[in-house]
Amino acid sequence: MDYTHQTALIPCGQDKYMPKSELLLHLKTYNLYYEGQNLQLRHREEEDEFIVEGLLNISWGLRRPIRLQMQDDHERIRPPPSSSSWHSGCNLGAQGTTLKPLTVPTVQISEVDMPVENMEMHSPTDSRGLKPVQEDTPQLMRTRSDVGVRRRGNVRTSSDQRRIRRHRFSINGHFYNHKTSVFTPAYGSVTNVRINSTMTTPQVLKLLLNKFKIENSAEEFALYVVHTSGEKQKLKNSDYPLIARILQGPCEQISKVFLMEKDQVEEVTYDVAQYIKFEMPVLKSFIQKLQEEEDREVEKLMQKYTVLRLMIRQRLEEIAETPETI
C-alpha cells in the first residue's frame, strides 16, 4: 500500500473532518498490527473519494433475546443425499434431472461357491450368441458399504434431514433450530462484517442483522465503543464505524465495538469511567476528600471577599472624613 502524504480532508462524522495524511498514518499502524491476518484494511480512490474497506469485528452485548427468521426466502437449502439412496452419480438422468432415489431391494444375499466352468457356461450372451455381455451399470452394484449403511436403524430419512436443515441457522458457528429461534447470543462473543468507510452506523447495523437473518428492527440497537476502563461511547447515526475503529486503534484489549440495546445502555464519559471499578468504601472516601477540598475552597473564597469588603469600607470612611475642598 502507498501511504503518501495527503492534505485532503476525510469526513469522520457529522461536521467532523480530519486530514487524509493523519488517517493514513492510523491506517498504517492498524495494518501493521494485523499483518498477515484477514483483518487488514485496504484503501482506494473512487471518483476522488477516499474509501477504506475490510472486516470490522463486532462483539455481542445484548441483554434481551433476539428473533431469527424461520426461513430464508432468498436461499434454497439443498439437503444432502440420504443414506438410503445410491452413491452420487446414479441419481441423475441423461438430462441432469434428479430421479427418485432407488430403494434397496429386500432380498436374501447369500454367497454361493460356483466352479469357474459353471460360471463361464451360464454367462449371459447377447441375442446373436457372440460373447458374454457385461452389464454397464456400475451405479446399481451393491457394495458391502451400502449394505452396512442400510442396516443402521438410526439414520434420518431425507424428509427429516430436509426439515432440520430448513430450520437451522448459525451465529458464530453455533446452530439453532426453530425451537431456539429466540435466544440471546453469548455476551462478548465476536462476529464480523465486511464494510467500508462510507457506511454509516445504521447501514452497518442493517448489514449485521441481515447477515444472521435477525427479524428485530435495527432501530432497537446501537453500536458502542467500549473501553476496558468502562468508558462507553455511543456511535451516532452520522458516524462511520470503520473510521471510528481505525481512530481508536487496532488493539481490542483496549477498546471494542459492541452491539447493544439502544434503551438499555447509557454512555459513560471518561471522567466517570475512572471511578467505575472502585469498591464502595473507596468511592465514599473519595467523596469525603472531595467534600473537604470543597470546604477549604469555600473558606478561602469567603476570606478573600471579607478582606475586600473591609478595604472598601475603610476607603469609604477615609473619604467621608476628608473636608471638602473648593
UniProtKB/Swiss-Prot annotation:
<dbReference type="GO" id="GO:0000776">
    <property type="term" value="C:kinetochore"/>
</dbReference>
<dbReference type="GO" id="GO:0001503">
    <property type="term" value="P:ossification"/>
</dbReference>
<keyword id="KW-0043">Tumor suppressor</keyword>
<dbReference type="InterPro" id="IPR000159">
    <property type="entry name" value="RA_dom"/>
</dbReference>
<dbReference type="GO" id="GO:0043065">
    <property type="term" value="P:positive regulation of apoptotic process"/>
</dbReference>
<comment type="function">
    <text>Potential tumor suppressor. Acts as a KRAS-specific effector protein. May promote apoptosis and cell cycle arrest. Stabilizes STK3/MST2 by protecting it from proteasomal degradation.</text>
</comment>
<dbReference type="GO" id="GO:0007165">
    <property type="term" value="P:signal transduction"/>
</dbReference>
<dbReference type="GO" id="GO:0048872">
    <property type="term" value="P:homeostasis of number of cells"/>
</dbReference>
<keyword id="KW-0995">Kinetochore</keyword>
<keyword id="KW-0131">Cell cycle</keyword>
<keyword id="KW-0597">Phosphoprotein</keyword>
<dbReference type="GO" id="GO:0045667">
    <property type="term" value="P:regulation of osteoblast differentiation"/>
</dbReference>
<dbReference type="GO" id="GO:0005737">
    <property type="term" value="C:cytoplasm"/>
</dbReference>
<dbReference type="GO" id="GO:0004672">
    <property type="term" value="F:protein kinase activity"/>
</dbReference>
<keyword id="KW-0158">Chromosome</keyword>
<dbReference type="Pfam" id="PF16517">
    <property type="entry name" value="Nore1-SARAH"/>
</dbReference>
<keyword id="KW-0963">Cytoplasm</keyword>
<protein>
    <recommendedName>
        <fullName>Ras association domain-containing protein 2</fullName>
    </recommendedName>
</protein>
<dbReference type="GO" id="GO:0045670">
    <property type="term" value="P:regulation of osteoclast differentiation"/>
</dbReference>
<dbReference type="InterPro" id="IPR029071">
    <property type="entry name" value="Ubiquitin-like_domsf"/>
</dbReference>
<dbReference type="GO" id="GO:0032991">
    <property type="term" value="C:protein-containing complex"/>
</dbReference>
<comment type="subunit">
    <text>Interacts directly with activated KRAS in a GTP-dependent manner. Interacts (via SARAH domain) with STK3/MST2 and STK4/MST1.</text>
</comment>
<dbReference type="Pfam" id="PF00788">
    <property type="entry name" value="RA"/>
</dbReference>
<feature type="domain" description="Ras-associating">
    <location>
        <begin position="176"/>
        <end position="264"/>
    </location>
</feature>
<dbReference type="GO" id="GO:1901223">
    <property type="term" value="P:negative regulation of non-canonical NF-kappaB signal transduction"/>
</dbReference>
<dbReference type="GO" id="GO:0001501">
    <property type="term" value="P:skeletal system development"/>
</dbReference>
<dbReference type="GO" id="GO:0050821">
    <property type="term" value="P:protein stabilization"/>
</dbReference>
<keyword id="KW-0539">Nucleus</keyword>
<keyword id="KW-0137">Centromere</keyword>
<dbReference type="GO" id="GO:0046330">
    <property type="term" value="P:positive regulation of JNK cascade"/>
</dbReference>
<feature type="domain" description="SARAH">
    <location>
        <begin position="272"/>
        <end position="319"/>
    </location>
</feature>
<dbReference type="InterPro" id="IPR033614">
    <property type="entry name" value="RASSF1-6"/>
</dbReference>
<dbReference type="GO" id="GO:0005634">
    <property type="term" value="C:nucleus"/>
</dbReference>
<dbReference type="GO" id="GO:0007249">
    <property type="term" value="P:canonical NF-kappaB signal transduction"/>
</dbReference>
<dbReference type="GO" id="GO:1901222">
    <property type="term" value="P:regulation of non-canonical NF-kappaB signal transduction"/>
</dbReference>
<dbReference type="GO" id="GO:0046849">
    <property type="term" value="P:bone remodeling"/>
</dbReference>
<dbReference type="InterPro" id="IPR033618">
    <property type="entry name" value="RASSF2_RA"/>
</dbReference>
<dbReference type="InterPro" id="IPR011524">
    <property type="entry name" value="SARAH_dom"/>
</dbReference>
